Amino acid sequence: MSENLSDNYTAINSDNDITANANNNVSDSSNNTASAGNNIADGSNNTASAGNNIADSSNNTASTPTVGINMESETSNKTPIKKEPKYKFETLDIIMLPVVFILAFLCIKYYNLNTGMVTLGLGATLYIVLYVISVLAYAKLKAVKFNSESIILSVLMILLAISFTVFYNYSLNIFMQIAMNFMLIYLPVTVFNKLIKSETSALILYDYINALVFIPIHNATSFWICMFSKRGKSTSSTKTKYFLHIFLGLLIGTPFIMIVIFLLSSADATFKNIFDHLFNFDINVPENIGTLIWSLPMATYLYALIYGSSIEDNSKSFNIDKFNKTMDNAVFIPRLSLYTVNAVICCFYILFIGIQAIYFIDILGGSLPADFTYSEYARRGFFELLAVALINIVFIAVAKIFSVKNENNKYLRIHIILNSILTLALISVDFAKMYLYISTYGLTTLRIIPSVFMIFLCFVFAFIIIGEFKKSFPVTKLSFYAGNILFVLLCLANIDAVVARYNLNAYMNGNLPYYDIYNLRESDMAAMPVIYKAWKNSSDKELKDKLHFCAEGIMGYYSFDIDEPISYNYSRNKAFEIKKHMNLN
């Protein structure tokens, strides 16, 4: 009888009382046997065998397994568990590598934190449109079903991107970039249905932070692992492998190619003209090398965001049930306390609205309160009322989140509805003030922007009121998209030209007695077509001189604007053409 045991061969002879074990030390005073790697002293006629029970006609064999041998045998019989890879790249994910790198280059070159309206133009539009198309195509090829939000958001982004090329919204520049930056981050998680509640909700802030920080960090290495990881034929085809090698070659060789082109352009005028005039290349080796270098971390981030959004499971990092339970445990404000505060505040609102109504009736009748002017009345308290409206939104949110849940909900709804209605009344007072201000002193962008914001607040409080009657009404979602739609429409309205046209026409018709035409100098280049048209058609020499002076002031202030083809902007280009026609300095 023979048996293999942990690299030892044990031979057992059943006719004798002696068992010999290979590689074991035996100490025996009678007829004893020591088993596999152990010293056993025994005074009887027993045989100890490692891991085996042997019965014999004359002797009893006791089996005494040792811990070390059991562990070794058990380990040797186990099949190693293969660790599941963190990333499972498909052919489509590999193809996205050069696409994302191109997007990163365009972002760094034509749309970055240092880019203002002086350089925002065709390049920024190209980057944003390609970004939207790339994300949508990537999702479509991954068999993702688009929801209505992803379509609406994509359309809004493209429209806002077009405004970068068509209009010169200098006064909206900062707001446009803030809105676009938010949507650029928010788009992938919307398209790939990775929002916490599968749609824009009250958790929009967490959804944005998740897209901005958590998903890119969790997938920070995906760009490089996808680029350099070894793949078998089962994971990538030969064509994909060649495609990746070509991309790597271009990525590594681009700086050297640019240096060669620069040197050849310097050596031959004809060669230089080919790139200068045919392709409009602006060869700046240090700048473009720096752009390529900065494009790598940007590509790493964008790929982590887009690819991570396609695979990330939000349930691992955010549990909605746990969140709701935490919020239930966090409530501590008795509703009676909220009712008391809201009742007192509403009383003050009613008193304030009554006083303003009396003032407004007097103003419509042609009389002003003592020691008041139109401008003082219109300006006084305008932004304070906007702040009050925002405070009311915060109050309503706190009331709904932190109030005790097991109390009667009926009275809370009544208080929220009352607060919202009075806030709408306060906004109406603000509208009345703004109307008086504009009709007396004309339009400015700083009067249009708050007016549009007030319209947005009207939508918000109207949605809040509806939400109190219909529990499933998506207040946050509709407010978010109402705000975005209003803002995009504002950007497409070319408000700087609208302001100049309204003021100039009203001034020439005698409807703005307090307006100073020299205020046109504060306009931007979007106002140049309006000024040029009035200058060209007017026969009043004094008016023409004033308009010429205003146009010189505008173009003198914006004379530093660049004129690159990739930074083309229709309004800016039109303004420079008008500058030539008006012979401006």
What are these regions (language model features)?
Residues 113, 125-272, 295-313:
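Transmembrane-helix bundle segments that line or gate the permeation/cavity pathway
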Residues 342, 346, 473-496:
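Internal/C-terminal transmembrane anchor helices
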Residues 520-585:
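Extracytosolic and intramembrane catalytic regions of membrane-associated proteins
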